[in-house]
Amino acid sequence: EVAEIVRQKHFGGEAFTRVWANFQSFGDESAFHRDFPVKYAQSARTAVWYPVMNWERDWGGDFITLSEDGEVDACALVKPNRLVVFNGTQTHAARPISRYCSELRIAVSFGCEVVNA
């Protein structure tokens, strides 16, 4: 149900070409990366959904994107049921989780190289 809502509202009804889940806890690292090659910069889209029931701000795990010159472009805190939509060719990463966090950071991602929305 969530996937269909995301597909219709943020992907113009286009089929996803990738769907994946990431699980992160204290001690896990996430490197900066792009979901799709830069050649899709005009059309790629990724949506990251956080299906967590509870998340404290001080637990970390923030989602961060970088500009083309490597500076922080945007940052979003993890919040229950939050959806972050961005250009899938943009460099991004999840920041580390605090040692005070005993929860699992869950992120479900939906992506498509060509979105006509």
Feature map (PLM): residue ranges:
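Fe(II)/2-oxoglutarate oxygenase catalytic core
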Residues: 1-83, 89-117
